Regions:
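Short alpha-helical segments and helix-capping/turn motifs at coil-helix boundaries
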Residues: 12-18, 80-84, 111-114, 223, ...
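Active-site-proximal binding-pocket segments
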Residues: 231-425
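Beta-rich, aromatic/charged-enriched effector core domains that present basic-aromatic interfaces
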Residues: 69, 77-200, 204, 389, ...
Length: 516
């Protein structure tokens, strides 16, 4: 009996463990474990759990079309899998466990190790697969780039046409989907849902993006209103839960470019999109090497300044204004309100809101990261918490600069027609762009005055962060150890990325000029 343990790989297509476990119609037991520990965490957002449950429902529907079904067990994952193996052994069935690697914090690392140890002690086989690219043998970051593209170009795993799941009974806590909705109903209470879960929806979303929505992606992705309307892929929650693989997306975009023929602008947009996929997987790889980075500063020089400790009353007041979208900075507040309602923001707004909290408010990224994870439908520790450290000015200390976004300048650059601000901050609908930029609304509307002086806090707090970065750089240069080598590799990767972006843009302009 092949136990097929789904986790963040909730799909049948291009799923290594599904293809191998179901081969030759061997008996397969597909299962998902609803672990109460996960749903009790403060960082678990309702939008994300609802998306997960919808994805499980769709996975069950797709399995039933192949003659199978999804078993929902409830309890501690380690205990359930151990008890399931014992139950099958008592029935005279030797199970083999199939599951994909998932980059985890310490809880998940310990859980997977305990499960593998149990199966080894009982002379039971395990097959550990990959749901997306990950270097798992040794530290070969200098080879990561080439290995990543080799993986993405490999043939997709073909979904089986039938899955043989015998009728079995188990003395284990199980749930039906009706049970799931009733027992965890707090995650289903929201009426409107902006992102629907499931492999079927993932494929439809990818199809609509590649057919029409991708046009102009390279510049629309940083415009929050256009991104909200579908100018970005909206695939991030699907990739986070594995209802779609990055390899499927990569190969589909390459096929679309070939289908379109000589269209430089389309090719440029889709190349920009594929680059984002690579960055996403590189963040996952980093957490695999350094799981502690999910909760600790990358460099100890920042530990006194960026701490998860409870905020003092003044900073707590700033933090609450930031959370509620009541800072008096219109674009920032629109973005934070969008997050609470949709469970999503485009990348530029996530970064802008993060730098404002960390640099201008002087509040640790730990607090902001928890808030994001409470609401993001696509929340992923590997990406989100590393991005928070980037926006806090912690990463890439060998570079002499770090970004601090100006919320008002970004109104001119990213929302000059004010559609995004008017939608999320209706208090300002009576004001035009010059009036909003000049603060004409202050003390004349229900909208709050700015909670801080942006220019002053940028200067003062920006210098504090800059000085800490210099200390890190000086130490790394003096030590010339592994930390320095990794920092140098990181800086080289960032520099190479921007060089490649410049090169791609120049190639696009040359092709565009040649086609006239």
């Amino acid at each position: 009996m092949h136990i097929l343990w789904f986790r963040r790989d909730l799909r049948l297509s291009d799923n290594e463990i599904v293809t191998i476990a179901a081969a030759d119609l061997k008996p397969v037991l597909p299962c998902f474990i609803v672990d109460p520990w996960f749903y009790e965490q403060s960082e678990v957002g309702k939008a994300r759990v609802r998306f997960l449950f919808e994805s499980l429902e769709n996975l069950d529907q797709n399995l039933r079309q192949l003659g199978s079904r999804l078993y929902l067990f409830e309890g501690n994952s380690t205990t359930i899998l151990q008890d399931l193996a014992k139950d099958l052994l008592q029935q005279g069935i030797r199970p083999k466990l199939f599951f994909n690697r998932d980059v985890q914090v310490q809880y998940g690392i310990d859980r997977d190790r305990a499960i593998l140890d149990f199966y080894s002690q009982h002379n039971l086989e395990c097959h550990l697969g990959l749901s997306s690219f990950l270097q798992t043998k040794g530290d070969r970051r200098d080879e990561w780039f080439n290995e990543y593209y080799t993986y993405q170009r490999q043939p997709l795993h073909v979904a089986p046409s039938r899955i043989n799941t015998p009728q079995l009974s188990f003395n284990l806590p199980q749930l039906t989907f009706d049970d799931l909705k009733q027992k965890y109903k707090k995650f289903w209470l929201k009426d409107s849902t902006y992102f629907r879960g499931g492999e079927t929806q993932a494929l439809a979303t990818l199809d609509s993006f590649l057919k029409r929505r991708f046009h102009g992606y390279h510049w629309k992705l940083s415009r929050p209103w256009l991104a909200q309307q579908g100018a970005t892929s909206h695939l991030s929650p699907h990739i986070a839960f594995g209802t779609l693989s990055t390899r499927q997306v990569y190969q589909s975009t390459k096929a679309r470019v070939a289908e379109l023929g000589d269209q430089p602008l389309a090719e440029f947009s889709l190349k920009a999109f594929r680059d984002r996929l690579r960055w996403r997987d590189s963040f996952t790889q980093r957490l695999y090497y350094y799981p502690e980075l999910a909760h600790t500063n990358h460099y100890p020089e920042f530990d006194d300044y960026y701490s998860p400790q409870e905020l003092d009353p003044k900073k707590q007041e700033l933090f609450q204004a930031w959370q509620e979208g009541q800072t008096g900075f219109p674009l920032l507040d629109a973005s934070m309100r969008q997050l609470k309602t949709m469970g999503w923001m485009n990348f530029r707004m996530r970064a802008m809101c993060a730098t404002f909290l960390c640099i201008n408010c002087g509040i640790s990224w730990h607090h902001g990261a928890r808030h994001y994870m409470n609401y993001l439908v696509d929340g992923d520790l590997a990406i989100d918490n590393w991005q928070w450290q980037m926006q806090a000015g912690i990463t890439n200390p060998l570079s002499d600069t770090f970004r601090i976004y100006n919320p008002n300048k970004n109104i001119e650059d990213r929302d000059s027609d004010l559609k995004f601000i008017y939608y999320w901050v209706p208090e300002l609908r009576g004001y035009n762009l010059p009036e909003i930029l000049s603060g004409a609304y202050i003390d004349k509307s229900e909208y709050p005055s700015p909670v801080l002086n942006w220019a002053q806090t940028r200067k003062v707090n920006g210098k504090i962060v800059s000085d800490m970065r210099k200390k890190v750089k000086q130490r790394l240069l003096a030590e010339q150890g592994e930390e320095y080598e990794q920092a140098a590799i990181a800086k080289k990767a960032v520099d190479k990325y921007w060089e490649s972006k410049d090169k791609q843009y120049q190639e696009y302009r040359n092709k565009q000029a040649g086609s006239r």
